[in-house]
Amino acid sequence: MKRQRPQDSMISVPLQNENSTTTPTKEVSHLNFPLKRPRLHSFVPTSKQAALSDITPDTPPAFKTPYSSLPYNLVPQNSSTSKKRPRAEDLLVIEPSQNSLVPSTQNNEWNEIARKRVSLESDHPDKSGQVIDLATGQILDKQTEDIDDDRNKSAVSKSLVRHPHRLKMLPFGIQSAHPYISSLNSNYPTTWHFASHYYPTDSKQLVKYHPTEVHPSWTVEEPVHYNTYDGVVNEPNSSVIIEELDDDYDELNDPMNNNDTPITNSTHSAQMSNLPTHDSMDIDMGGAVPSTST
């Protein structure tokens, strides 16, 4: 039996200027008229539903983008807004291997770690002119030539760096030691403890360390500033000076450096600075600029 559609006369439509309190649904509710349109398969006989199920529905149109007309290989891929800091081309990297002493230039995630270069000058024959990596304790290069002049010996490992922080270390005795880097070489094993000190109000800070012959170790800590009788603040006999240097810093033209001092033959050496005549150690944080030595 077919359903009967409601007659138009049975539906009350309010006039244009008349507020109606009744709705058409109340008038036609006795006819069991569906209020919502039923789904398509409700009106399809069972014999035809199987045939309709074999029909593949149309694919909805894809959202148009500015790159819709470009080939797939030319469409720019989505990337994060935060980009990695580009690694300096002259950054010297050492693989985290205890046996490898050869600098590696492989570009992997480990190489993105900021490096610390250390050059050491000492009267000890096994520690003369060594340049090591603080993160691994491996030797980057070694200067073997003898230096007779004590003035040159104090600054033999000075080098140019791009990083704005540079550390100059001079020996100072303390008793504590903390294992940070061990066994720099087999003849004179040492243990390192490195700590950085940054104070926004100071342009330089002092840090001290000491190698002991009984327990060969190097420890870094912050020393105490003191005044002499003439009112001048002096450094301890050995210390680390953290200099705040701009990216455009020109070490060769620095008035604080002694430009008359000859340049050494070390691979990472540059113009000598006017440092005290003590055993010295320079720690360069960041990538090293190619040497200007001749």
Curated annotation (Swiss-Prot):
GO CC aspect terms: nucleus
Sorted UniProt keywords: Nucleus
Keyword Transport appears in the UniProt entry: no
Domain of life: Eukaryota
Compartments where found: Nucleus
Transferase listed as a keyword: no
Segments for region (Disordered): 1-30, 51-86, 250-294
Chain intervals with Polar residues compositional bias: 7-26, 66-81, 255-277
Coiled-coil residue windows: none
Protein name: Uncharacterized protein PB1A10.05
Native source organism of the sequence: Schizosaccharomyces pombe (strain 972 / ATCC 24843)
